[in-house]
């Protein structure tokens, strides 16, 4: 697994785009040390929202 891109939203929220050994992309949505994985960007963003992230109030870093 390698990290292709990371977006930090502040307050411990982050979204990583990852690539596995087969070259497939997937996503890791995290709040601090708690992370969930998804094959789809939309689902990963939904995971962030489920962890309490509000896209209307995020600070893009």
List the predicted regions and their residue ranges.
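Short N-terminal "domain-start" leader segments
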Residues: 1-28, 35-36, 58-60
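Alpha-helix N-cap recognition
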Residues: 40-41
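Short arginine-rich
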Residues: 50-59
